């Protein structure tokens, strides 16, 4: 399974590590994915992986089951 948010499709970010000696190495920041249960349109609940930012938004709009 890809490390992506299943609702917003937010994926990892890429950048550089910079050491004290100014050496550059590539690195990846993964999204903080958390499992949660969401109500679908037909009233059923589905378990999905969402980022913590999306989880906050779902809690704000009462979309969690």
Curated annotation (Swiss-Prot):
Pfam families the record matches: Ribosomal_L28
Residues spanning the signal sequence: none
GO terms of biological process kind: translation
GO molecular function, one term: structural constituent of ribosome
Ranges for region Disordered: 1-21
InterPro entries linked to this entry: Bacterial_rp_bL28, Ribosomal_bL28, Ribosomal_bL28/bL31-like_sf, Ribosomal_bL28_bact-type, Ribosomal_bL28_sf
Superkingdom per UniProt: Bacteria
UniProt keyword annotation of Ribosomal protein present: yes
Record-level GO cellular component terms: ribonucleoprotein complex; ribosome
Keyword Ribonucleoprotein appears in the UniProt entry: yes
Alphabetical keyword list: Ribonucleoprotein, Ribosomal protein
Entry-linked HAMAP family: Ribosomal_bL28
The family this protein is said to belong to: Belongs to the bacterial ribosomal protein bL28 family.
Protein name: Large ribosomal subunit protein bL28
Organism expressing this protein natively: Mycoplasma pneumoniae (strain ATCC 29342 / M129 / Subtype 1) (Mycoplasmoides pneumoniae)
């Amino acid at each position: 399974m890809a490390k992506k948010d299943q609702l917003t499709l937010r994926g990892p970010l890429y950048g550089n590590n910079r050491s004290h000696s100014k050496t550059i190495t590539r690195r990846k920041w993964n999204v903080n994915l958390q499992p949660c249960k969401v109500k679908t349109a037909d009233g059923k609940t589905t378990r999905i992986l969402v980022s913590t930012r999306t989880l906050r938004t779902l809690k704000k709009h009462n979309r969690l089951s």
